[in-house]
Structure formats: structure tokens, C-alpha cells
UniProtKB/Swiss-Prot annotation:
PANTHER family: COPROPORPHYRINOGEN III OXIDASE, MITOCHONDRIAL (PTHR10755), OXYGEN-DEPENDENT COPROPORPHYRINOGEN-III OXIDASE, MITOCHONDRIAL (PTHR10755:SF0). HAMAP family: Coprogen_oxidas (MF_00333). NCBIfam families: PRK05330.1. This is Coproporphyrinogen-III oxidase, aerobic 2. Residues 75-84, 287-322 are annotated as: Important for dimerization. The active site is at 133 (proton donor). GO terms for molecular function: coproporphyrinogen oxidase activity; protein homodimerization activity. Homodimer. The record marks 197 as: Important for dimerization. Belongs to the aerobic coproporphyrinogen-III oxidase family. Pfam families: Coprogen_oxidas (PF01218). Pathway: Porphyrin-containing compound metabolism; protoporphyrin-IX biosynthesis; protoporphyrinogen-IX from coproporphyrinogen-III (O2 route): step 1/1. Key enzyme in heme biosynthesis. Catalyzes the oxidative decarboxylation of propionic acid side chains of rings A and B of coproporphyrinogen III.
Amino acid sequence: MGRHSDNSLQESANHTVLLTSPTNTIPKDSRQRSQQFMQNLQDEICTALEQLDGKASFHQDHWERAEGGEGRTRVIREGRVFEQGGVNFSAVWGNSLPASILAQRPEAAGHEFFATGTSMVLHPRNPYVPTVHLNYRYFEAGPIWWFGGGADLTPYYAFKEDAVHFHQTLKNACDVHNPEYYPTFKRWCDEYFYLRHREEQRGIGGIFFDYQDASGKLYVESQTDSSVAIYSQKVGNVARNWEDIFAFVQSCGQAFLPAYLPIVERRQGIEYGDRQRNFQLYRRGRYVEFNLVYDRGTVFGLQTKGRTESILMSLPPLARWEYCYEPEAGSPEAELTEVFLQPRDWV
């Protein structure tokens, strides 16, 4: 990992400090601290993944954004374990807010913005090893701020113990901060990673959250009758400040490696053939569809004129589509979509 530049990226100018109430105050060093955490998370994940793969290494591209900001894109390809994967870090700022942000938070209009985050997608070679996604981010626009993120698992073959392990590890990280975090954000994850045009879940979920700030609301979306909306209404508002939520996000980020690596180690040696490989490529097509149609990070990146190669690094190197494909009844492939991907309480 020594070839990776660890020079700290510069914090943007004109950092607004909010002084309205103790619970909603933005620390003076909020941008520096959030940015540093995202960089460190990228470093830790890349180091561990290289050690696990044992063959391939991450290639880094450092890029700059003309409107303000820069980042580090790291891609691993043709490895022993990982066919392709990427771990991105970025910190961007500017005066023009993208439409995707204004649609959700119109009160941010008129303010310069700052956004930093780390995102990751790994596409393993072996179909028995699940694809995994992680994203944690922080956003500021004048007095408006929030954290978002999560991690989710997309298996191609059903292993209950893997799903339980992944969810339990994330739940443990959440429970340290609030026992209502996991049940709320698990439901939100099931809602978010859903392909409406296919009426299918993308995977077995994990946790997902967005717009987490001092307002106290755990679920911040327009739906009022979904499972997560109803659950969040029962929970009510949760008193938190910037430091509370930042600590929670750090715990979630640090839970990724113990949540995912044991699964890879259990499954990477299982033998597979053309049938399993073809099904993996077919299901990867669903991943492509979600990321290009629904993913907020993709939309935000393209609307803010981010680096296109970095934004689309989440896509797999190979995928396939087959007209009106139907898996054989009773097969492991049929079990995945008919049974295993249906939302449930894993822990």
C-alpha cells in the first residue's frame, strides 16, 4: 500500500459554522474530520482486500474536479478472488447544488456545498462469493448537513449463514449507538435496493440510511406507508448531534471488513462450472440496471460533473441479459429469487 498517496486533500474554503443550537452545531473541523475518516476507511479496506486476494493490487488514479475538489479512485482487476472492484474516495465542493440534492433538501439552495465520501463495489470471480457494496458520505451546504451510507450484500447462491453473519455484524455496530438503528436502517435498505421495474430485491440487504442530522428523524423519505416509514414513526424522533452521528458512521465503516471477509474465506474455494458462471453474469445484469437507473450516488456524481470513470467503476466487467429467462424449477438459481432474496429478519 506504500504506493498510494496519503497526502491529505485540502479542505474547501468558506466553511460555514452553524451557531443555532447545541444539538445542531456543526464543529469547526467537521469537513476535515469527515474527509480524513473517509480517506482512512479507503486505505484500511484496500490494504485488507489486497492481502486477501494475494495476487492483484489496487491501481490508483488521483483526479481533480475543475469546479472544486479531488479524489482517489482505486481499482483491482483480474485477481485471484476479485475479478474487478473499486474503492473510491472523493471530496468535492462548489457553489452550484445539483438537482438531485435540491429535490430532497430545497432549503440548501443558495449555499455553497461540500461533500465527501468513500464508496466501494467488489465483483468476485467465484459465483459462490457474493458481490458487496459500501458507501458512507457526508454533506454540508451552509447550515444544512447530513450523513448517509450503508453496506449491502448481493449473493448469487443462497447461504443462510452468510446472510446471518453479515447482518449480525452490522447490527452489532448499530446497537452500540442506538438499538433502533439496525431495525430501521435494515428496512430502509430493503426498500432502497429494490428494482421496481423487475419487482425484485437486488440482494439480501444490510443497512442503508440517508439525511441523518439533528432533526431526530431516522427515516427521511416521502413514503408514509412502507415498512420502514411505519416503523420509524413508531420509534419517533431520536435526539442526536453531529458528533453522535459521526461516531455511528465510523462504527459502521469499521464493521465492513469483519462482516465480509469471513464470507469470502468460506466460499472462495468452492468449485463451479459454466452454469454457475452464466447465472452470476445474468444476475450481474440486475446490478447494472439498479446502478444506472436508481442509484443516488451515480445520479449525484453525473449531475455534479464528477469523474465518469470513477462513478461507473461500480459496474461489473462482464454481465449478460437473456430474454425471458426462467431458472429451472426447484434449482438453486430459482431458490435465490423466489425465496432467498425476499426481505426477512435475518437476526
